[in-house]
Amino acid sequence: MDRAGPRTVMELGVALMGAGLLLAPLTREPWHLYLTLGVLVGGGSVCLGYSGQSLFLPYWFVRRRGLAMGLAFAGVGVGSITLLPWMQLLIESAGWRAACVAMGLLVLVVLVPINLLLRKRPQDVGLQPDGDAAPPPGVAARPASNVVDTAWAAVDWTLGRAMRTARFWWIAFGYFCGLYAWYAVQVHQTKYLIEVGFTPIVAAWALGLVSLAGIPGQIALGHLSDRIGREWVWTASSLGFVVCYLALILLQQSPTELLLYVMIAAQGVLGYGLTSIFGAIVAEIFEGRHYGSIFGTLMLAAIIGGAAGPWVTGALYDLLGSYTLAFWIGAGLSGLSTLAVWRASPRKVRVVAGRVHRLAPRSA
């Protein structure tokens, strides 16, 4: 992304995902599925999803960075609600192979032309961040007014320099814990709800409602982060996962609809807000020419956490015959992720638009 820009990265993602979906129907061995739906589609989704979008959206928006990213990532929920039922109907009527071909063609036809319109920075097409007017010819652009730590912001942050700071590792730890908690519950909640007494249909609908609730949650919390700061919204989102885990634990003793809806609302409306500020936190601490490589490396920690969460949760269930300890661990790691983001303290480098008026002229 730092060298080639979003069009190359996104179109690579389209090619990988399209190839994986179109080749999957030709599989004859299990490893064929691992390669097509696992490696190719999985790799494509990394380029096209949260990681890919977060690599260039922060360049386009400063004052409304959280809102912009919340709107972008809310599309995941919209896609889940609209496309998954269609895919299910197609699988039931024509089989999974036909469904893969249809989805592969849809990905290629829709995303290839759309991604050709992408640019890394607004300056590449004569614009300014947030839609501001460009300065007159010969007049330098006014420097950003949201910088708190001028010495830190003046550094040309490379990946190597970033990795030698405590902030980098606090972010990595926070992202690991955050995605551990997210994917641990997302992968196991349907099975758990059936286990405590809900019907398979209700359990499946609960997961769908979480995605639905996440749409306004991501947008609202992204906007809120532009007003009060990234740390506070990360705290609210992590609290959502803590409440979600506590509700799941209580459901074991009292499987009521009220607790089910509390779990859904906490996870969707609050928890999904994490995605709205993933890129913003890193951009405000390590903004610069090498932001892409820094963010991409930090997302490795997030991906490892997202993979570890479901695996550890499943292993503990197999060992103990219960999800209780695993859910307590998820809740605890949500709390630790909050501590880590506060320690990284993006507000001490650059403040959000809603706090700019509180800045007093100073240098670090």
Q: Model-found features: residue ranges?
A:
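Interfacial helix-cap and linker-helix signal at transmembrane-aqueous boundaries
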Residues: 1, 82-94, 193-194, 224-225, ...
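Hydrophobic core of transmembrane alpha-helices in multi-pass small-molecule transporters
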Residues: 20, 32-48, 176, 258-273
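C-terminal membrane-cytosol helix-exit motif in multi-pass small-molecule transporters
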Residues: 104-146, 340-345
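Intracellular juxtamembrane helix-capping segments at the cytosolic ends
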Residues: 45-61, 273-286
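Extracytoplasmic gate region of multi-pass secondary transporters
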Residues: 160-223, 309, 313
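C-terminal ends and interior cores of transmembrane alpha-helices
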Residues: 15-28, 240-253
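Helix-loop-helix hairpin linking two adjacent transmembrane segments in secondary transporters
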Residues: 76-124
